Amino acid sequence: MTNIRKTHPLMKIINSSFIDLPAPSNISSWWNFGSLLGICLIIQILTGLFLAMHYTSDTVTAFSSVTHICRDVNYGWLIRYLHANGASMFFICLFLHVGRGLYYGSYMFLETWNIGVLLLFAVMATAFMGYVLPWGQMSFWGATVITNLLSAIPYIGSDLVQWIWGGFSVDKATLTRFFAFHFILPFIIAALAGVHLLFLHETGSNNPSGLSSDADKIPFHPYYTIKDILGVLLLILVLTTLVLFSPDLLGDPDNYTPANPLNTPPHIKPEWYFLFAYAILRSIPNKLGGVLALVLSILVLAFIPFLHTSKQRSMMFRPFSQCLFWILVADLITLTWIGGQPVEHPFIIIGQLASILYFFLILVLMPITSLLENNLLKW
């Protein structure tokens, strides 16, 4: 009798994706982040669902409903902090996942990579709208500042902003629609993640060497299921440690003050995972230029496959490119730090230099270095 997992229509899909999937024998722990992102998404959807049962998307009651969740709902504080810090874990995994793709040349799978970029935009949009929901000071002013950026779009800008706001300022209509979008987007993200996997399984996984692994494949189960479970346990360990010992470590104290349109906080800044993009936005004095740079800071990822000039796929055997990659990582850490600092000397000039370096590295230095390495190897 044939095994049910190989005959049943639904089980066949699961089997070919997670059990009998041929995987390269040499993929390292950097390949764990895909499954970790899946776990993060599940955690976020589940905790978000339970939060939505008690949350009210009204400007008058939103803040107090979050307080009510933390004080009166059974384990409400746990659900709320798992959701808030789960977002941080989500972005840590996202950045590492993208970094892995850049280092090992996974971007050569064009469809998979482009859907990944789309997913990154969707997750960032979801996180931004989620940050607005508690209706604290930073929620309100963050929403005001970021949505206002759209007014830089010529001709239709101001109409577009009012259309998004549902009025002449960030108010009840804005909060309600942000809640609706924040609820629906994770399910769209889940569907996109399914398509992301579908395209990945068309080609099979890349591996650290960047060479074809067709000659040496192993089944996904038990080898990589066990490996993924270890990653998941470590993720849960870090997340629960964060939630139970210092749940507000990554948050902003200003968000514990109810939103007040008449009082602007001294330093308006987004959550830590947006600070690098925020620093790039602030480094350009012109409003439209800043908005374009902000979008390009993520959209530049979509151009990377076309800037690949090396004859090797991975950076594993390319020391000069490795140096530039780690300079890029250091540059992003610098931008994240600058994004959280006030707009004053010397932070302004550091931010501007780091922003220039970010685009210069990706668009100019890395492709040229790859060509140089080809010549050094007489390829």
From Swiss-Prot:
Residues holding heme b b562: H83, H182
Keyword Transmembrane: yes
GO biological process, alphabetically ordered: mitochondrial electron transport, ubiquinol to cytochrome c
Keyword list, A-Z: Electron transport, Heme, Iron, Membrane, Metal-binding, Mitochondrion, Mitochondrion inner membrane, Respiratory chain, Transmembrane, Transmembrane helix, Transport, Ubiquinone
Annotated cofactor note: Binds 2 heme b groups non-covalently.
Cofactors required: heme b
Entry superkingdom: Eukaryota
UniProt: a ubiquinone binding residues: H201
UniProt entry tagged with the keyword RNA-binding: no
Cellular component terms (Gene Ontology): mitochondrial inner membrane; respiratory chain complex III
A Pfam family hit: Cytochrome_B
Subcellular compartments: Mitochondrion inner membrane
Bilayer topology term: Multi-pass membrane protein
Sites where the protein binds heme b b566: H97, H196
Record field: transmembrane: 33-53, 77-98, 113-133, 178-198, 226-246, 288-308, 320-340, 347-367
GO MF term list: metal ion binding; ubiquinol-cytochrome-c reductase activity
Function comment: Component of the ubiquinol-cytochrome c reductase complex (complex III or cytochrome b-c1 complex) that is part of the mitochondrial respiratory chain. The b-c1 complex mediates electron transfer from ubiquinol to cytochrome c. Contributes to the generation of a proton gradient across the mitochondrial membrane that is then used for ATP synthesis.
Complexes and interactors: The cytochrome bc1 complex contains 11 subunits: 3 respiratory subunits (MT-CYB, CYC1 and UQCRFS1), 2 core proteins (UQCRC1 and UQCRC2) and 6 low-molecular weight proteins (UQCRH/QCR6, UQCRB/QCR7, UQCRQ/QCR8, UQCR10/QCR9, UQCR11/QCR10 and a cleavage product of UQCRFS1). This cytochrome bc1 complex then forms a dimer.
Additional free-text comment from the UniProt record: Heme 1 (or BL or b562) is low-potential and absorbs at about 562 nm, and heme 2 (or BH or b566) is high-potential and absorbs at about 566 nm.
Family of this protein: Belongs to the cytochrome b family.
Protein name in the entry: Cytochrome b
Organism: Soriculus nigrescens
